[in-house]
Amino acid sequence: MEKTNVRELQDVVIRFSGDSGDGMQLTGTLFSDTSALLGNGISTFPDYPAEIRAPQGTVAGVSGFQVHFGSHRELNPGDYCDVLVAMNPAALKANRKWLKQGATVIIDGDSITEEHLKKAGFATLDPIAELGLDEYNVVIPDITSMTREALKQTGLDNKAVVKCKNMFALGICFYLFDRPEAYAYKYLETKFARKNPVVAEANKLAIDAGYNYAANTHQFANTYTVSPAPLEKGTYRTVNGNVATAWGLCAAAEKAGLPLFCGSYPITPATVILEELAKRKDLGVKTVQAEDEIAGICTAIGAAFAGNFAVTTTSGPGLSLKSEALGLAVMTELPLVVVDVQRGGPSTGLPTKTEQSDLSQALYGRNGECPVIVVAASSPSDCFHYAFEAGRLAMEHMTPVILLTDGFIANGSEPWRIPSMKDYPAIQPPIVDDAPEGGFMPYVRDEKLARGWAFPGKVGLEHRVGGLEKDCVKGCISHDPANHQKMVSTRAAKVAKAADDIPAQTVWGDPEGDLLVVGWGGTRGHLQNAVDQMRAEGKRVSLAHFNYINPLPHGVRDIFAKFRRIVGCELNEGQFANYLRQNLQEFRYEQYNKCEGLPFTVVELKEKFESLLK
């Protein structure tokens, strides 16, 4: 079908929104995956309600999926949307504040009933006027009715037919943005064809019906194209942060030549890592779904003692429960990676929302002097790299490492260039195969201060580990004051020495200027976009973004000294800023903090930076 009034855009933000059962996550995923296959840069933001099943039709039960796709790499899912697809009035109301001026709004006309409007908290029967959308491009197709009409010959009951209405909405968006239907068709055939081919065919018919509706209605004045992004040559796929983390851990095990063991307890939003690792039996991965968080980490510690690359995964509440056993891993000096996918807290908090509020817990949340290496990933795709790095540091330095991600990058997705494992270095743990002359001494150390890793069952390498303090050489239990002081200092020095084994800190932008923006972890995309926009306006603003938290990389002091002002931006109340004050006391740190369960927006960051430059 030939299209007229086609406009080319650099980037577009679409949000699909509806009840939890409306299939918005699948709709957004199919649209974003299709865009990725067309070569667009993409960044996504799945947004789930915190309740398992909030009351249907209420604002509390709204589920959303935001897609930012463009003709260049997209670093974040966008602040405000160009297009909102709302399956009911509650979705319209919940997302009103996220609309760009003049945005296109598509809402299912069948859902605009007195009952639905009352559930959503509207005071009138005209949601468009009540929300001030008269100047917006509002399209109100009867999506549910047209889906029923399109599928009336399938033989499916009404409940099954109505479940396909999200695919009708997807078809509309495919037409508007010149997306082919082929990938979505293939996905549906793969998912349903064997077990329920009628459902697969019904969903395909719904996509086609939505596409044809959009093509034949006069309510869409324009259609749009978005050119592919220039990408480095290679093989790409879309990946979310949890899956990338699992694969990075598998890669670390492969490069170390050791089996991977994961002992974990399911917890939102980290469970997908355990599920993905459980699929990798072909790579020799062993997983245990333990009865609780404590059992999960303790099985991992036992696996590390037995010669495995050991991992446990969790979120903030689970990290609290693992704290005593994490101290045991520090005392035994066994390699262990703890992946903490941060969520809103404290306590149960906001299980499906993002936050960066576990940093202080990761740094200090254990009894005694108990330092660990702390690493943080910045995007869905680089979760692979930093999971690999966490494994490398844990095994080569014989210490636990906490890898911090968060709900935003764990569930979000973006294109990922699949690396060649030849580009990754071999991981060389200090494994002891034979007893040295004079006998094996478990706490004799190498140049990194790492002790030898001797596996059970080898003659002459018998030794004990445990939570009681050990002699600094022989490893037997010791309560000697001088020995305890030495071991405390040595464990701290070992973690500090890891700074020699990580990249020096870098700056995005000029090496000196009026304002240095400091961030860490999953906020990088928003911070970098804000800094780039200000630099384009002639402002002397740069970004120092941290992935290695403890120890801090070399070069930080020299970088900070070259800027007039420093502002730390975090999705917490200033935990990294306080950590910097502790370690680099000569600098003054401004703060911009947010604890709303949402990522930063570029707009609010720029407003803060502008105020600091006045």
Predicted regions and their residues:
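Short glycine-rich or small-residue beta-strand-to-loop segments that form or flank ligand, phosphate
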Residues: 12-19, 169-171, 260-263, 310-313, ...
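Flexible, low-complexity linker and terminal segments
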Residues: 239-248, 256, 386, 391-614
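Peripheral docking tails and interdomain loops at the edges
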Residues: 20, 143-146, 152-157, 171-174, ...
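Gly-rich Lys/Arg/Thr-decorated short loops/hinges at beta-loop-alpha junctions or inter-strand turns
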Residues: 50, 149-151, 219-234, 252-259, ...
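A glycine-rich phosphate-binding loop feature that marks nucleotide/adenosyl-phosphate handling sites
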Residues: 48-49, 188, 206, 227-231, ...
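Active-site cofactor/cluster-binding pocket
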Residues: 1-256, 554
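Thiamine diphosphate
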Residues: 11-100, 247, 252, 260, ...
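Conserved thiamine diphosphate
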Residues: 78, 133-136, 140, 144, ...
